[in-house]
């Protein structure tokens, strides 16, 4: 039993009769906790903690449910994601392509002209029973007149014929920088857009599509915060979304913070916006704000993840490793020197050990000139990080945030680099053993989903969402250790490890009551977990199941045709398994090209079952059909 002080009989909230994972030093479980003024004041058994209650105290019987500290997403494009959330149909966690296409069909019927239907990139073709993505023929049949954009992770996107017409794409349209428009034998764009290797080329294709109004962006941000609460996320570190202008594009989240209506705590980084003028960009941010500006719900934290355009170490494993330019060191040193001088924490996207070594050369040189002296900094991702560079990061006081990219791209990594290299990609256990701060984040929302239980599943099971084994037992984490990475571990990256990430007296009363017992259920069921009761700052922000009567009101979704207004349209495995399997069989059988006439695909073996593909390879010579679907012309 843990108890702070003798009770003052004045708790605002007491939850009891639960299985509460405190994440204290001993990893203790308790049955009850008490909250006062947004902070935990006591934890322990029911009898002792209920002594903190009086007639004014709200008491919630947990009925034996499991409680965890609110999850902290250490790498989320929360502010940018909030601005577009109401526009996006999500296929995250849907078990079959047939069901995904059913949702698409329903949304097409609901979407008025000239709006587009957009599927965000947080899904994998290999999560589907059919082991393939949609064909362009399927998209055109579903939406002959409505523009449809379907993004697959950060590697590719499908645009149906209506989208190509809306964009004015034809045989004279050049390939976008950093990408490729697949073409038919006559040079016409087929509708398949490939990131080669920059995923920004995918989202840029949507720039001409209608955007939300200011009022709808505000609503969209509210709905996204609630969606995060529904999966137990109570805090996020915003990694500095590309394309955002500070402070203009932060208006929605700042308005909600000013009104006291944010339900997810956000510490945000600011990134470079102009290639070749990054020092000027950061000098501007330094003049406008400073780390710590804001409050407990919204504040400036630091710089990144884009510190330098030429230092973007992309991780599309369908493409070769990015070769960074020789000018990188001098240019990056100028940026880091400015940040260290002004004591701005910073983060940098880094996939490959070769790049990480060069980045560390710069950091070590700057540190000799201007000591970091406790300044917090980190790398994001680090799939191929070596033991030698783990030691160098530790020596400079840095940390690493990992994202479940291997859960979605593990098969691609294995195809390019081999199963042996994949066994420690990223080397989470080695980083923890070296004493490195390690946090977990989603990388959402454009190229990844926001469900933290996918990351927990990946760290515990060592498997991809498609079921491919990636890691041996010695490289996997236990459930408590994985949870610690996604709570206390992540809190370190915003200097909040003494306020968040554990349920002990004095810390924020941020916690989630789970739909099932994370510590006991079959590991394969972890991605289906959600929160039935989420509390932030001692207040209920989400409630479901037996706690539904406690749910606070949420504004109606706007616009009314938003996918978010359609129950289930934001993803999740809420389909009946038998029906999903039946629809999957039918969908797999329909995988052959449906394009008629002389422009038909004519690819050998086209009618085969897509599920036979061991791994989808977009560039296989002489074979344009794979698990991502048919590459046939969209016209």
Per-region residue spans from a language model:
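Bacterial Sec-dependent signal peptides at the C-terminal "C-region" and cleavage site
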Residues: 1-10
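Divalent metal-binding segments
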Residues: 9-16, 21, 25-286, 299-355, ...
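Short helix-capping segments at alpha-helix termini
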Residues: 258-263, 292-293, 366-374
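Structural alpha-helical segments in enzyme catalytic/regulatory domains
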Residues: 291-293, 394-397
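His/Asp/Glu-enriched, well-ordered alpha-helical/loop segment
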Residues: 337-347, 351-377, 381-382, 387-391, ...
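C-terminal functional module detector
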Residues: 491-493, 499, 513-526, 532-535, ...
């Amino acid at each position: 039993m843990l108890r702070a002080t003798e009770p003052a009989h004045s708790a605002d909230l007491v939850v009891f009769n639960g299985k509460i994972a405190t994440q204290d030093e001993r990893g203790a479980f308790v049955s009850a906790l008490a909250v006062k003024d947004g902070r935990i004041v006591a934890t322990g058994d029911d009898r002792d903690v209920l002594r903190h209650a009086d007639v004014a105290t709200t008491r919630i019987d947990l009925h034996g449910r499991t409680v965890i500290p609110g999850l902290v997403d250490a790498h989320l494009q929360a502010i940018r994601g909030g601005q577009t959330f109401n526009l996006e149909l999500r296929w995250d966690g849907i078990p079959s392509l047939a069901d995904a296409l059913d949702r698409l069909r329903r949304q097409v019927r609901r979407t008025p002209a000239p709006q587009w239907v957009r599927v965000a990139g947080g899904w994998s073709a290999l999560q589907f029973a059919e082991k393939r993505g949609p064909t362009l023929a399927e998209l055109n049949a579903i939406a002959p007149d409505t523009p449809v954009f379907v993004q697959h992770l950060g590697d590719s996107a499908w645009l149906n014929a209506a989208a190509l017409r809306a964009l004015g794409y034809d045989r004279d349209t050049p390939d976008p920088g950093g990408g490729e428009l697949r073409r038919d034998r006559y040079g016409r764009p087929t509708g398949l857009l490939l990131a080669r290797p920059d995923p920004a080329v995918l989202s840029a294709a949507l720039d001409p599509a209608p955007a939300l109004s200011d009022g709808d962006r505000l609503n969209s941000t509210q709905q996204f915060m609630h969606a995060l609460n529904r999966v137990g996320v109570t805090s996020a570190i915003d990694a500095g979304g590309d394309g955002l202008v500070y402070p203009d594009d932060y208006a929605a989240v700042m308005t909600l913070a000013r009104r006291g209506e944010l339900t997810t705590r956000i510490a945000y980084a600011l990134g470079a916006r102009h290639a070749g003028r990054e020092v000027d960009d950061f000098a501007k941010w330094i003049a406008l704000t400073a780390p710590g500006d804001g409050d407990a719900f919204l504040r400036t934290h630091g710089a990144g993840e884009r510190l330098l355009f030429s230092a973007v170490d992309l991780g599309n494993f369908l493409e070769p490793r990015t070769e960074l330019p020789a000018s990188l060191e001098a240019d990056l040193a100028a940026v880091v020197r400015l940040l260290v001088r002004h004591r701005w924490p910073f983060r940098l996207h880094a996939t490959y050990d070769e790049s990480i070594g060069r980045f560390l050369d710069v950091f070590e040189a700057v540190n000799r000139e201007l000591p970091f002296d406790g300044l917090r900094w980190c790398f994001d991702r680090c799939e191929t990080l070596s033991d030698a560079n783990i030691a160098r990061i530790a020596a400079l006081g840095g940390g690493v945030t990992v994202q479940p990219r291997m859960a979605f791209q593990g098969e691609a990594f294995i195809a390019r680099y081999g199963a042996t290299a994949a066994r420690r990609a990223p080397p989470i256990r080695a980083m923890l053993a070296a004493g490195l701060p390690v946090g977990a984040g989603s990388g959402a929302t454009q190229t990844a989903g926001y469900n933290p239980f996918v990351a927990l599943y990946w760290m515990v099971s060592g498997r991809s969402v498609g079921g491919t084994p990636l890691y041996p037992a010695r490289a996997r984490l236990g459930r408590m250790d994985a949870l610690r990475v996604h709570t206390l571990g992540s809190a370190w990256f915003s200097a909040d490890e003494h306020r968040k990430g554990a349920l002990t007296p004095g810390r924020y009363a941020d916690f989630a009551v789970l739909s099932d017992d994370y510590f006991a259920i079959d590991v394969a069921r972890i991605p289906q977990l959600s929160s039935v009761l989420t509390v932030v700052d001692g207040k209920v922000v989400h409630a479901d199941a037996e706690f539904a009567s406690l749910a606070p009101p949420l504004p109606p979704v706007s616009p009314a045709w938003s996918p978010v207004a359609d129950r289930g349209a934001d993803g999740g495995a809420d389909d009946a398994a038998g029906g999903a399997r039946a629809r999957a069989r039918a969908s797999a059988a329909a995988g052959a090209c449906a394009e008629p006439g002389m422009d038909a695909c004519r690819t050998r073996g086209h009618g085969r079952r897509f599920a036979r593909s061991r791994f989808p390879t977009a560039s296989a010579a002489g074979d344009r059909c794979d698990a991502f679907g048919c590459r046939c012309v969209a016209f």
